[in-house]
Amino acid sequence: CHFIYSETFIQGMETSKQKTLKGSFSLYGKGLHTGLNLTVTFNPAPENTGYKIQRIDMEGEPIIDAIADNVTDTQRGTVLERKGVRVGTVEHGMAALYAMGVDNCLIQVNGPEFPILDGSAVMYVEKIKEVGLVDQNAPKDFYIIRKKIEITDDNGSNITILPDEEFSITAMCSFNSKFISSQFATLDDIHKFSDEIAPARTFVFVRDIMPLLQANLIKGGDL
């Protein structure tokens, strides 16, 4: 896969305020990999909290920061782990929070992963719209891209980040399949996420099902 991400300093950024949810909401469903019945609850959080995930099923209800440094696995889902606290399949929820403009949120889950729901981010987006957002007093922090950044992993996946006058993400992906050709898509406005990206659903090739089951994954993948 190859991703190209571009962003620059937007006029007015320096006066933007952090935002959190106006209220809490919960979503229920099976975990994609564990098959467990799970509940995840998104709550308002104070300024400068960021995204924090609390395992309320564990002793002491420990909290893990949803940051890149805590990503330990990306096989069929994003896993965060630190000091024995582990939570997986967070990617749809995290994407929805960011795209909808939520800066601070405490997320409580009663198991080792978020529920898969319908395999997309739509339900997260709908709930965020339903409860709404509230401005906070602290200014929003921004990363400003001033020069090209490029990262390639051992599998050949590549991310290129470029300065630009507008926000955009372009993704290209090859599935090595005679049934699905290489895919190409562009998101040129983050506000289009709810309509153009959120409905995209997780899928799997038949050829991959047995290896995934043997890896003790997709126990809840009966959508």
Predicted regions and their residues:
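C-terminal regulatory domains involved in ligand/effector binding and gene-expression control
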Residues: 5-103, 108-223
